UniProtKB/Swiss-Prot annotation:
Regions that span the bilayer: none
Annotated protein name in UniProt: ATP synthase gamma chain
GO terms under biological process: proton motive force-driven plasma membrane ATP synthesis
Membrane protein topology class: Peripheral membrane protein
Family per record: Belongs to the ATPase gamma chain family.
Protein keywords: ATP synthesis, Cell inner membrane, Cell membrane, CF(1), Hydrogen ion transport, Ion transport, Membrane, Transport
Gene this chain is encoded by: atpG
InterPro entries: ATP_synth_F1_ATPase_gsu, ATP_synth_F1_gsu, ATP_synth_F1_gsu_CS
Record organism: Vibrio alginolyticus
Domain of life: Bacteria
Any one Gene Ontology cellular component term annotated for this protein: proton-transporting ATP synthase complex
Record has ATP-binding as a keyword: no
Pfam families assigned to the protein according to its UniProt record, in alphabetical order: ATP-synt
Length: 288
């Protein structure tokens, strides 16, 4: 019965692991709801900012902010958002693949690539790959704040202001629903013009800037970039919790199936051992 004992020990080990994955699934489900609330609370602000900036980019302003000017893309920057922890399926690798594919397209055009990374997974992945990382931030936790991101965003904005970058993108996982997380690349700079039909129809008016366009736009456009990066971070956080919940549920279900299989093997081994003992008893009695 040595084999049966080993199987019984393995069943106990799998059951212990199953308890852990079930607990992690429940924790992730709870955190996902909170993350979704935070994401949905900030999404209207980010979307409204995008509409306002889209209108500003289409306007004929007396003051043309540098962020509105198109220039030849010789240096391209990416702010890549990832998680600090694993056990969330292919969430990180999917967004990394999306970013790497886009980077390769720019490299083929002769552009240099520079990164700012959010989350320890992106830091490890791109540093291991030899990428040029200008800024990094990790340890944001389950309640990231805009203040945590200003430093890294500021580094990339300064490089853009000084002509060290000609394009700036943010890469993150967009939360579609619990089952779908979509790797997304959004252009931050130069400011993307709105190409929606609604905006084109309504573009017969313009904003009045008080007191002057320059100081207002200098502040507004920086806030716009910060808000889009922050939205990417909270979207990615909701995706992380959803992906972890799904991964842990799959692990729990797999553990259940494995336990069933092991119990079947155990019962067969036990039955074989009993049959062998009975055969030995019958054989011994016949010999007598």
């Amino acid at each position: 019965m040595a084999g049966a004992k080993e199987i019984r020990n393995k069943i106990g080990s799998v059951k212990s692991t199953q308890k852990i994955t079930k607990a992690m699934e429940m924790v992730a489900a709870s955190k996902m709801r909170r993350s979704q609330d935070a994401m949905e609370a900030s999404r209207p602000y980010a979307e409204t900012m995008r509409k306002v900036i889209g209108h500003v980019a289409n306007a004929n302003l007396e003051y043309r902010h540098p962020y509105l000017e198109e220039r030849e893309a010789k240096r391209v920057g990416y702010i890549i958002v990832s998680t600090d922890r694993g056990l969330c399926g292919g969430l990180n690798i999917n967004v990394f693949k999306k970013a790497v594919t886009d980077m390769q397209t720019w490299r083929e055009k002769g552009a240099e690539i520079e990164l700012a990374v959010v989350g320890s997974k992106a830091t490890a992945f791109f540093k291991h790959g030899g990428a040029k990382v200008a800024a990094q931030v990790s340890g944001l936790g389950d309640n990231p704040s805009l203040e945590d991101l200003i430093g890294s965003v500021g580094v990339m904005l300064k490089k853009y202001d000084e002509g060290e970058l000609d394009r700036l993108y943010v890469v993150f996982n967009k939360f579609v629903n619990t089952m779908v997380q979509q790797p997304t690349i959004d252009q931050l700079l130069p400011l993307p013009k709105s190409d929606s039909e609604e905006m084109q129809r309504e573009h017969s008016w313009d904003y009045i800037y008080e007191p002057e366009p320059k100081p207002l736009l200098d502040t507004l456009l920086v806030r716009y970039v910060e808000s889009q990066v922050y939205q990417g971070v909270v979207e990615n956080l909701a995706c992380e919790q959803a992906a972890r919940m799904i991964a842990m549920k799959a692990a729990t279900d797999n553990a259940t199936n494995l336990i069933d299989d092991l119990e079947l093997v155990y019962n067969k081994a036990r039955q074989a051992a009993i049959t062998q003992e009975l055969s030995e008893i019958v054989g011994g009695a016949a010999a007598v």
